[in-house]
């Protein structure tokens, strides 16, 4: 029997008195030692149990550790659920929630025709080549966009025969990270995520994820923060999910990231994204 992302995610949620504890499996890694942003959103969505079109939000205050039971509080709010995730010192790591959305879908962004591969890693949940639970997605980029066509792996099936929502939240978060990195020339993290799940899609259908580089803009009051817009659609262009995700550039963080990525990626690719950190 295949171990799935959905089953592993749900197994990490446990009752603890009147509260919950969330333990994110190490295979849900994003940057080394840190949970992928899409995994926390998916945990909020799983706990909420809301059907239909919905928005899942998360504001990340600090990096989220893996393999550690974290206190998760939930409370009804505006027909949905408010969620807050705390570390062992009772510091807020992520706050957000899930709410039904009535607004009609917007159109999906068009993918590029060709492009150069974005870097991949060994262990990342979204792109890690050796992460057997992960998506193993390969995104591309050109002067206009970040995009990719992803064929779901059997680990991404939900129990009801649809694509697990964590695949969509992670793909959108991954695309937003690279849009921010390309715009800033720096590594960093996604810090404010709002993903709308417009509809479910049968497991096995390919997903097109895309984001326009021209729509990636620095905040006027703080140019470390970059606002991105990303979409996920089926091959016919019908929207499945969309996201408004903020990337924060952390000056100098790319130095360590590039060092690790050089084992699997050509210097010429890394140089185009992180020119100040790649020889």
What does each model-found stretch correspond to?
Residues 18, 52-54, 68, 144, ...:
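A generic structural signal for short beta-strands and their flanking turns/coil linkers
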Residues 93-96, 241-243:
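A structural microfeature
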Residues 34-53, 163-188:
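Active-site helix/loop of acyl-thioester processing domains in fatty-acid/polyketide metabolism
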Residues 233, 239-246, 254-256, 260, ...:
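Mixed-charge, glycine-accented linear interaction segment located at domain edges/termini
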Residues 27-34, 153-167:
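Short histidine-centered catalytic/ligand-binding loop motif
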Residues 100-102, 215, 247-249:
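A short acidic/small-residue loop/turn micro-motif
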Residues 1-22, 78-80, 87-91, 97-158, ...:
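Non-catalytic linker/capping segments at the edges of enzyme domains
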Residues 54-92, 195-239:
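Hydrophobic beta-sheet segments that form the core/acyl-binding groove
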């Amino acid at each position: 029997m295949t171990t799935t992302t959905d089953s592993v995610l749900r197994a990490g949620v446990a009752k603890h008195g009147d509260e919950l504890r969330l333990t994110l499996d190490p295979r849900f890694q994003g940057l080394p030692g840190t949970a992928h942003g899409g995994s926390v959103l998916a945990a909020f969505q799983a706990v909420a149990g809301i059907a239909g079109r919905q928005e899942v939000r998360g504001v990340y205050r600090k990096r989220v550790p893996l393999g550690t039971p974290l206190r998760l509080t939930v409370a009804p709010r505006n027909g949905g659920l408010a969620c807050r995730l705390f570390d062992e010192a009772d510091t807020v790591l992520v706050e957000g929630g899930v709410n039904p959305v009535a607004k009609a879908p917007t159109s999906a962004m068009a993918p590029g025709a060709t492009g150069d591969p974005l870097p991949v890693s060994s262990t990342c949940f979204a792109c890690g080549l050796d992460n057997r639970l992960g998506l193993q997605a390969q995104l591309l980029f050109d002067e206009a966009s970040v995009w990719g066509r992803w064929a779901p792996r059997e680990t991404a099936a939900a129990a009801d025969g649809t694509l697990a929502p964590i695949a969509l939240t992670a793909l959108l978060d991954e695309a937003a990270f690279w849009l921010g990195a390309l715009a800033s020339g720096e590594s960093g993290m996604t810090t404010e995520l709002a993903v709308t799940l417009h509809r479910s899609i049968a497991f096995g259908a390919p997903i097109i994820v895309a984001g326009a580089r021209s729509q990636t803009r620095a905040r006027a009051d703080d140019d470390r923060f970059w606002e991105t817009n990303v979409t996920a659609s089926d091959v016919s262009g019908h929207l499945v999910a969309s996201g408004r995700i903020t990337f924060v550039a952390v000056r100098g963080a790319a130095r360590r990231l590039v060092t690790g990525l050089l084992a699997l990626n050509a210097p010429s690719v890394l140089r185009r994204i992180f020119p100040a950190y790649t020889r």
